Amino acid sequence: MNVTLLIPARYGSSRFPGKPLAPINGKPMIQHVYERASLAKGLTNIYVATDDERIKSAVEGFGGKVVMTSPDAASGTDRINDAINQLGLKDDDLVINLQGDQPLIDPTSIEQVISLFERHPGEFEMATLGYEIVNKAELDDPMHVKMVFDNDYYALYFSRARIPFGRDTKDYPVYKHLGVYAYTRRFVQAFAALPLGRLEDLEKLEQLRALEHGHKIKVAISAFDSIEVDTPEDIRKCEQRLAVD
């Protein structure tokens, strides 16, 4: 199975401009993401998908591969769709979408979503990752997206609010979403053509578009947390984690 991993990266960010190039222990964040991804087994190719020449230069500087995408991409999926069209992938080729703000992603987590497609061919259109929240401060932080899934590990909903809500107890597991997606080229194109969902627009969570239109998202539970970098403070958290790893 041909498996292409794409890392969408944009320079502009309202909370953290230039985030992909922010240094973490002397290397740009995008390099950490790329190098972590390259340790995952089963990948055919890895590319950074960007519309910014500064990011392109940085990636090529450490030996990475880049696909230049349109600056008009309205979402991460649109950027992924643009990239796979340029790469000429086949309809059944697997695409891994690894968010560019995941410098500490564990390679085995990437392998988990690949394995879901290998073990359950044709049973779902999309796969992603969850992690049981340990840090209680994340429970009510809208920057940490929560998720619920059924007994067969199919996603039921994603939210910036704490879900599920325990009416009579606070002692229960809550899972957060990790920014890794897997889908076929065929589904990426179909997904990009779907209209914006009402819930997607409310929560500002693109994956809800798939659920709103009746598509199935399979979930793998990772044993490893991954810090998502949204602010400069998160850079310091990454450096602290790397110091003890």
UniProtKB/Swiss-Prot annotation:
GO CC entries: cytosol
Subcellular location: Cytoplasm
Transmembrane parts of this sequence: none
Catalytic activity: 8-amino-3,8-dideoxy-alpha-D-manno-octulosonate + CTP = CMP-8-amino-3,8-dideoxy-alpha-D-manno-oct-2-ulosonate + diphosphate
Keyword line: Cytoplasm, Lipopolysaccharide biosynthesis, Nucleotidyltransferase, Transferase
Top-rank taxon, per record: Bacteria
An MF annotation (GO) of this entry: 3-deoxy-manno-octulosonate cytidylyltransferase activity
GO biological process, one term: lipopolysaccharide biosynthetic process
EC number(s) reported in the record: 2.7.7.90
SUPFAM superfamilies, per database record: Nucleotide-diphospho-sugar transferases
Cystine bridges: none
PANTHER family: 3-DEOXY-MANNO-OCTULOSONATE CYTIDYLYLTRANSFERASE (PTHR42866), 3-DEOXY-MANNO-OCTULOSONATE CYTIDYLYLTRANSFERASE, MITOCHONDRIAL (PTHR42866:SF2)
Function of the molecule: Activates KDO8N (a required 8-carbon sugar) for incorporation into bacterial lipopolysaccharide in the Shewanella genus.
Protein name in UniProt: 8-amino-3,8-dideoxy-manno-octulosonate cytidylyltransferase
Organism: Shewanella sp. (strain ANA-3)
